Design a protein with these regions (language model features):
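Small-residue (G/A/S/T)-rich helix-start motifs and N-terminal tracts that mark the onset
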Residues: 1-109
């Protein structure tokens, strides 16, 4: 939903937007997100954005980041699936197939 005007988010509005998870829900039924993030020295941005994505309700998260951020990301967000880029300082490769993902975030870090 795209909203051209600012909207105040109160409990009533949020109750209409947010859904209760079914009791039989699991990571495979709650959506797969892709986060394209990270340059050298900016792994904190990746970590915060990845946590926010998972806390917002994504069942699975794939994080496309550079090789140098691998250890930091595996330690700070171990539940994220890492898709490591060949770039040393910043992302070089593009992701050709976005069909596995229900949402894509680009740009933090």
């Amino acid at each position: 939903m795209i909203c051209p005007e600012p909207v105040n988010l109160d409990l009533n509005r949020m109750a209409k937007i947010l859904r209760i998870r079914p009791e039989d829900a699991h990571k495979g039924t709650m959506g797969h997100a892709l986060l394209v993030a990270g340059s050298y020295g900016m792994a904190g941005c990746d970590s915060v954005a990845a946590e926010a994505c998972l806390r917002s309700g994504a069942g699975k998260l794939t994080l496309h980041t550079i090789q140098k951020n691998r250890v930091i990301m595996q330690m700070s967000v171990p539940e994220a699936i890492l898709l490591l880029d060949s770039g040393k300082e910043y992302l070089l490769a593009s992701i050709q197939d976005l069909s596995p993902y229900q949402s894509v975030g680009i740009g933090p870090g």
